[in-house]
């Protein structure tokens, strides 16, 4: 801690550390030791094995073996409500943190059972702001299958992976077959044949859906949502073409433009 380092702009974007200048190292610098236990839940920290590189990742993380680490649960709520997931307007990180601290939410399904009368009486809130949040949450309850798969926060399942999986399952009934051990094993073998789904994603799906706590969380969530089937457009001027967005867009975000093209 306290070293002077040389960095370069890698990939034209990311600052990459090339080396530490030991000639400029002060006597009072300290070696940084990565925590061997999660400061939140106490689980032993790990470096995950990457099935693509066949090496351990550089990142040290909490494995959350029981899927009950409070820090991870809270951050998953933020991910769930984010723009690329359920996109709940006006339900940002600060509000989620506030409701978490007040023990009003812990799991995604809790969002759809909030007491808005109580919320209207909180500091900084009122009838109008509570009503607007209620409307935004109700609006978010209609969601496509791919958005749901991404929103529940399965490790290594990003937006494109979620779309690939949704294209395979098509509807929530088929997707729920992952909940059952015998069917899950057979399905996971099929998924390995899909473009963009590799051993890393399949292992992550197996770990996630083998946990009873996760199954309860997702099952309770599904009851609160109107999940539409995944539909692939096979018509239009963009069908079969690869579209790339670069630079800034004036009237919409890249995600919104991408959604329109799809």
Regions found by a protein language model. Name each.
Residues 3-15:
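Short, charged beta-turn/beta-strand-edge "cap" motif at the junction between a beta-strand
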Residues 5-6, 66-123, 128:
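Long, charge-rich boundary regions
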């Amino acid at each position: 801690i306290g070293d002077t380092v040389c960095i370069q702009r890698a990939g034209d974007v990311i600052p990459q550390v090339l080396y530490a200048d030991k000639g400029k190292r002060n006597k009072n610098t300290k070696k940084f030791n990565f925590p061997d236990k999660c400061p939140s839940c106490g689980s032993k920290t790990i470096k995950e094995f990457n099935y693509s590189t066949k090496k351990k990742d550089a990142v040290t993380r909490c494995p959350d073996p029981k899927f009950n680490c409070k820090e991870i649960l809270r951050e998953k709520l933020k991910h769930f409500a984010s723009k690329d997931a359920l996109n709940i307007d006006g339900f940002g990180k600060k509000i989620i943190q506030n409701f978490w601290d007040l023990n009003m939410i812990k799991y995604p399904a809790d969002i759809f059972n909030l007491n808005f009368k109580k919320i209207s009486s909180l500091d900084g809130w009122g009838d109008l702001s509570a009503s607007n949040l209620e409307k935004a949450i109700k609006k978010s309850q209609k969601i496509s299958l791919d958005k749901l798969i991404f929103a529940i926060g399965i490790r290594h399942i990003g937006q494109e992976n979620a779309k690939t999986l949704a294209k395979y399952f098509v509807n929530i009934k088929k997707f729920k077959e992952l909940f059952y051990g015998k069917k899950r094993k057979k399905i996971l073998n099929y998924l390995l044949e899909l473009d963009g789904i590799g051993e890393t994603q399949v292992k992550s799906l197996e770990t996630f859906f083998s946990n009873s706590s996760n199954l309860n969380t997702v099952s309770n969530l599904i009851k609160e949502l109107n999940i539409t089937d995944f539909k692939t457009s096979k018509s239009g001027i963009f069908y079969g073409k690869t579209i790339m967005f670069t630079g800034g867009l004036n009237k919409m975000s890249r995600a919104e433009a991408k959604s329109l093209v799809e």
